[in-house]
Amino acid sequence: VPVLAAGGVATGRHVAAALALGAAGVWVGTAFLLTDENAAHLTEGEVEALVRSQATDTVISRAESGKPFRQTRSAWSEEWAAPGAPQPLGHPLHDVLVGDILGAIEEHDVKPLAHSGAGQGIGWFDRMRPVAEVMADLAGGAEAALDRLSAAHGPAQGAEQGRVPA
């Protein structure tokens, strides 16, 4: 059964590490947030929050929909996590409660409250780029890391037949 590695995969070295550990592939998410192709889905405030974020600037919050969601820290997530704040309702009730407010925050680009879903790999990205560049960096970085690994330790067992070791 093929296994995909997910979570924290942000660079070609991360891809290579997952493959070296036996994954058949990787699932990448955060690397594509700050891409030109995704720009239409982000406000200026969201882009600013993503660009300045490091791994420690993400939080798991239920303040968005009632379900746990990793996002960039904002005044919105901080207020919902503050002592004495009400507990978010479960999904979908919380979304009904705050959905219009979140829509207005996005529509009017209220920067202190702006946030975006993002994994802890967000710190690897500091600018908007085309998806083609992200893909080239992932593939090129993985290939270089796997070449270094192979040179240092020899090819993986089964690599000569083009198979990923089990």
What role is predicted for each listed range?
Residues 2-4, 10-166:
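Conserved active-site-proximal phosphate/metal-binding subdomains
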